[in-house]
């Protein structure tokens, strides 16, 4: 454990200059102000004044700092909003802008860290990559030789102070942290910013960017234990260490593993039987070749580690141990499992020939049709058994808008599940959306689906649903064990930034 601490301190020593002066820079809040203006969540009040809002935000920042050093308890209470004219028209809008400004300022040291990592290295930069795309290499990797998997729900901090304390290792500017802490404690609804759920937690739409940044940084900190274990389990220390860092920081990972000619070799180093790891949002999958006893020790070790070193309350029931051979892996709407593929091998011995029955393991990824139909039913495209229905709330739109919305939803689903070899379930989803679109159009024109299709033809809908946009995508070639030729390429599109966005236009 002492060596693990030294590894952490070595990374944390790479700190940057003070960021406190940036809080007063006008261009920071101009950028944050522009981001908030693009949203309509806080701009419903008719009294909002665009010209004076940025000036009021700057005044508010100065006033907050003055009150902080005078130790005067002031900020955003319901009673004070009418007494103090500095708050202006919409205090929610100004607090949102301030939090956006915080997000811009605090992200600067980590952006500089990324640039220093990429400096002097030949990387193909792609700015449309998202962390959700990191699941593609995981689904392409053949992990059927592993025995057990840990299905982990990451514990969340019970107090925002824990998130702020984590930043101390990277931001050596104490004034910025004091100001951030002061603002968080005086903000009236900070307790409602974290919304607990049954299996995980999420942040409300208000100030989501800033709090997601704090949470993701906190998660990356206690993921560092896996970096340490990875360095201890490989003989190729430098390559293995860097490759595992790629799995944590997606921008570096995807550029190293996908866009270099040595992709296969680097991925092979990572697929060492000891550990296979992937995370997205609040869920972690940890696969290993170890026995059930070893995985159980892992389970209780992680619980103790999070509680003792990061003050995160976790329970063993949030970590499930499953055997990969008889358990399907449900991860981000991808249903993966290991199945036995029967094979017939012909053996020739002198004049006698024999047929030998055998089986090989294959890691398959399927489309979970039942949850998909449930999502479509919740969005009112079909009933609970998958029978298409019309979408009344869209009947007031133009015909082209209705068709485009349905086609957009299908393209999102199709691209998200594009890597599947068997697309039978996708055809069913297409049928539901296509017929729901036809019924919505027929409802608008006070007609029947049969009469509407005779008048315009269903070929019009088919054209919209099959029209593909020019989208950047990835392919992972697999080498044949006999001839070395490429086969079975699956396409993974990179235009997906959310999971099954069925209500994008709502």
UniProtKB/Swiss-Prot annotation:
GO terms for biological process: mRNA processing; RNA splicing; tRNA processing. PANTHER family: MATURASE K (PTHR34811:SF1). One of its GO terms (molecular function) is RNA binding. This is Maturase K. It is found in: Plastid, Chloroplast. Keywords: Chloroplast, mRNA processing, Plastid, RNA-binding, tRNA processing. One of its GO terms (cellular component) is chloroplast. InterPro entries: Domain_X, Maturase_MatK, Maturase_MatK_N. Usually encoded in the trnK tRNA gene intron. Probably assists in splicing its own and other chloroplast group II introns. It holds the Pfam family Intron_maturas2. Belongs to the intron maturase 2 family. MatK subfamily. The keyword tRNA processing applies.
